[in-house]
Regions:
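Charge-rich, low-complexity N-terminal segments
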Residues: 2-72
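Disordered, low-complexity tails and leader-like regions
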Residues: 6, 22-24, 119-123, 172
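Amphipathic alpha-helical interface surfaces
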Residues: 67, 71, 129-132, 154
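Generic solvent-exposed, charged/amphipathic alpha-helical segments
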Residues: 72-76, 159
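A mid-sequence, solvent-exposed acidic-amphipathic segment
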Residues: 76-85
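Short, conserved beta-strand/beta-arch hydrophobic-aromatic motifs that form part
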Residues: 85-141
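Short, charged low-complexity intrinsically disordered segments located at boundaries
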Residues: 99-108, 184-194
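Well-ordered alpha/beta subsegment
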Residues: 133-192
């Protein structure tokens, strides 16, 4: 029996047929099997890491990095604002209280603000209430920044959140966030093996 015969699935839809549907590249015999194994190995490898907020941001698209940078600059434009990273998010404090948090969920930056989400139910902001999660109890206003218009809305919402703080001027320079591969992130402690 030839090696090409070994690659044929036996009756029904086998794993190889499902892989062929995902990887539409036609390759000869043994190479096809190697490509499929490599594809599934890469998928499996990607699931074996717990990624920190910074790791997600570092490996995000330029659009996500730009939106994050704009929101970061908006928050840092107020006197006394300090930020720090935790595993899940970046927290912004001013006057001794938490005013905002930002994280990346999937491919979307998500902003949490110290505003009451119930006051914004039927508004253009489409706020979500995150108060049921203890880590967002102080910043229950959950707002997805999934478009340029939402960046403008974030500016308005941050202005409302920061009313009691002095505006000192917003930087137009976005933070530089160079891409790093998984190996580098692992070495830096920004991702953990599960």
């Amino acid at each position: 029996e030839s090696s090409a015969d070994n690659n044929k699935p036996e009756g029904g839809k086998g794993e190889d047929e499902a892989a062929a549907a995902v990887v539409p590249v036609a390759v000869a015999g043994g190479e096809e099997k190697e490509d499929k194994e490599e594809f599934y190995s890469a998928l499996e490898e990607n699931k074996k890491f717990d990624r920190s907020f910074r790791a997600k941001l570092i490996q995000s698209s330029d659009v996500v990095k730009e939106r994050y940078g704009e929101v970061y600059n908006m928050l840092m434009a107020y006197k006394g604002v300090k930020s720090r990273y935790s595993w899940d998010c970046e927290t912004f404090k001013a006057g001794g209280k938490v005013v905002a948090k930002i994280t990346v969920i999937g491919k979307t930056p998500v902003l949490f603000l110290a505003l009451d989400p119930t006051e914004y139910i039927d508004t253009k902001y489409r706020a979500e209430d995150a108060s049921k999660y203890s880590k967002y109890a102080n910043t229950p206003f959950r707002f997805k920044i999934n478009g340029e218009r939402k960046v403008g809305y974030a500016r308005e919402l941050i202005g409302r959140t920061m009313q009691e703080f002095e505006f000192t001027g917003e930087s137009k320079t976005l933070p530089d966030i160079p891409y790093m591969d998984d190996e580098s992130l692992l070495a830096e402690g920004l991702i953990k093996r599960i």
